[in-house]
């Protein structure tokens, strides 16, 4: 598929960060109420930006992580439409019908001390944990669930495990 496919969907990249033991990094969305407030890093692609460059940039901005090795990526765009409540808020939809995403899988090769939820001025997450890839579709907002199911299917060969929540410094 090309950039012209799904022209009403904002180009976006998503990142699944795998611990060396196969667990995945999950971030709890800052200021979003449970139960659907855990997700992977993701974000928009700048005009003319290479997709993998965008994925590495988003990962660094949202988590502080730069010590990674590429494991794989999804083929083509995976799309989702915004639900009516998002479409009704121009701040969130910004004229787009939804998002089209390419997902990247990386192995984390750094130390956990590298993870910094305040690496960028725009905080996306207020806590993080290692979890199981197969649990992620149940943790995400329902309108993104199909995307996460596709990502699980694409990257399941890299996965297994679970771990406790780690919060930003000063958070309970």
Swiss-Prot record:
GO terms for molecular function: bis(5'-adenosyl)-pentaphosphatase activity; guanosine-3',5'-bis(diphosphate) 3'-diphosphatase activity. Its EC number is 3.6.1.-. Signal peptide: none annotated. It is an enzyme of class 3 (hydrolase). Disulfide bonds: none annotated. Belongs to the Nudix hydrolase family. RppH subfamily. This is RNA pyrophosphohydrolase. It comes from Caulobacter vibrioides (strain NA1000 / CB15N) (Caulobacter crescentus). The gene is rppH.
């Amino acid at each position: 598929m090309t950039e012209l496919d799904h022209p009403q969907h904002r180009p976006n990249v998503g990142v699944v960060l795998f611990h060396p033991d196969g667990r995945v990094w999950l971030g709890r969305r800052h200021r979003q109420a449970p139960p659907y407030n855990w997700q992977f890093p993701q974000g928009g692609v700048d005009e003319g930006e290479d997709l993998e460059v965008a994925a590495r940039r988003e990962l660094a901005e949202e988590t502080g992580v730069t010590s990674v090795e590429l494991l794989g990526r999804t083929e083509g765009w995976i799309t989702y439409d915004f639900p009516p409540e998002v479409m009704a808020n121009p701040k969130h939809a910004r004229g787009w019908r939804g998002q089209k995403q390419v997902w990247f899988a990386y192995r984390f090769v750094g130390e956990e001390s590298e993870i910094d939820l305040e690496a960028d001025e725009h905080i996306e997450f207020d806590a993080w944990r290692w979890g199981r890839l197969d649990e992620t579709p149940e943790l995400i907002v329902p309108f993104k669930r199909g995307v996460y199911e596709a990502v699980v299917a694409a990257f399941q060969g890299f996965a297994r495990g679970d771990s406790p929540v780690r919060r930003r410094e000063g958070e309970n």
